[in-house]
């Protein structure tokens, strides 16, 4: 597998964004393991839910309504939500202050159950915080397998938003990998995951940068 040097990608991205200083200012926060351990369970559930509602919808509208989501679902407190009877879930799903989509609202309870179960086995925040980013695609698959509507990029976007170091298979990143003949099958296949993980690991070794920043820089290099 022949890869473009990451320095070349970085320089192209810097040119696209008007210089290194502007490029650096665009890079997201990557939290330390300890900082991720300190993230409360209700914040993980809130961000999972936000990303589920943003999927296939206008992100701006979800963000505008988010304070209402927080209020309607009690700040996404896990145990409170798991004790809520079905008829109250149905009532909350029809609240006009949120986006009324029953299939997405239903994921809140299901993903709360995933977090609760992980806490019985050592802790959800600990699981995610200590997961080796060198095998980050396996964490995406864990979320898809154990949660609800967390396939595609939804789980990965959640991790990025909270601060876990992860690359994203965005349209631009996928286009880069295809243009350079690094992948040729479906982007969500195990083979593509393995190749992408290897590519990003090599760039990380070259640059010493977090996967999140490498992923963003590849995106910015595409124009």
Language-model features, listed with the residues they occupy:
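Alpha-helix C-capping/helix-to-loop hinge sites
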Residues: 51-55, 76, 95-96, 115, ...
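Non-catalytic, well-ordered alpha-helical scaffold segments
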Residues: 42-46, 67, 102-109, 137, ...
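N-terminal polyanion-binding entry modules of DNA glycosylases/AP lyases
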Residues: 1-101, 105, 217-223
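C-terminal accessory module of base-excision DNA glycosylases/AP lyases that mediates lesion recognition
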Residues: 1-30, 124, 128-223
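Alpha-helical ds-nucleic-acid-binding substructure associated with the helix-hairpin-helix region
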Residues: 74-149
């Amino acid at each position: 597998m022949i890869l473009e040097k990451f320095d070349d990608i970085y320089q192209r991205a810097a040119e696209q964004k008007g210089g290194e200083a502007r490029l650096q200012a665009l890079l997201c926060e990557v939290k330390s393991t300890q900082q991720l351990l300190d993230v409360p369970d209700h914040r993980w559930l809130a961000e999972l839910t936000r990303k589920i509602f943003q999927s296939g919808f206008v992100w701006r509208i979800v963000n505008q309504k988010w304070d209402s989501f927080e209020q309607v679902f009690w700040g996404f407190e896990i145990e409170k939500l798991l004790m809520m009877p079905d008829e109250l879930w149905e009532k909350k799903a029809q609240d006009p202050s949120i986006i009324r989509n029953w299939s997405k609202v239903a994921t809140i309870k299901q993903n709360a159950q995933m977090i609760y179960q992980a806490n019985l086995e050592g802790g959800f925040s600990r699981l995610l915080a200590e997961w080796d980013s060198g095998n980050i695609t396996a964490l995406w698959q864990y979320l898809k397998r154990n949660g609800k509507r967390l396939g595609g990029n939804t789980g990965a976007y959640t991790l990025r938003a909270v601060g876990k170091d992860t690359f994203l298979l965005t349209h631009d990143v996928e286009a880069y990998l295809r243009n350079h003949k690094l992948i040729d099958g479906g982007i969500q296949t195990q083979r593509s995951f393995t190749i992408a993980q290897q590519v990003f690991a090599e760039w990380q070794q070259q640059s010493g940068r977090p996967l999140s920043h490498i992923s963003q820089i590849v995106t910015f290099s595409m124009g």
